[in-house]
Regions:
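Polytopic transmembrane helical bundles with strong interfacial aromatic enrichment
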Residues: 1-158
Length: 158
């Protein structure tokens, strides 16, 4: 029962993080194009600030639930006197998670700080440049997230 609970929250974390990136790229950003640069950059800054917080919570949930599920599987194998051989799709999830986490941290620490400074100083071209960099890295993370979803579903063990 605990494993099923952890898996449900793990999947919820995936939905929030991947879905949030898709929403930002394919819905909010294109809709914001009708706004003048000061309003557009200010709106995207406010949305990114909220999204980065929500995504950080989703990432923490993913990590805690994923690590707990691996630990439970390892513990069950040990109790049964078996060697624990983690499936390839689990390794893929873990490796992709850490790559995506590094990209997320880079967005938050580098690009969002540039965006925040640009909005504070009302330097709209600088804000637009920071948003372009964020868009590129969010696109990378979205592709990685979709890849791992397909890989895991086709692998069939997760």
């Amino acid at each position: 029962m605990l494993y099923a609970f952890l898996k449900a929250f793990h999947l919820l974390g995936v939905v929030v993080w991947i879905g949030g990136m898709a929403f930002m790229l394919f819905c909010l950003r294109p809709a914001a194009r009708v706004l003048e640069p000061p309003a557009r950059v200010t709106l995207m800054h406010a949305a990114m600030k909220r999204f980065l917080t929500v995504a950080a919570v989703a990432i923490a949930v993913l990590f805690v639930c994923g690590a707990s599920m691996v630990g439970m599987a390892w513990s069950a194998a040990a109790r049964a006197g078996l060697a624990f051989n983690m499936p390839l799709d689990w390794y893929t999830m873990i490796a992709t998670f850490f790559v995506m986490l590094a990209v997320f941290i880079h967005i938050r620490v580098v690009h969002f700080r540039r965006l925040d400074a640009a909005v504070t100083a009302a330097k709209w071209p600088d804000g637009a440049a920071a948003l372009a960099a964020i868009r590129w890295e969010v696109s990378i993370n979205l592709v990685l997230g979709i890849f791992v979803i397909f890989f895991v579903r086709l692998g069939g063990t997760a």
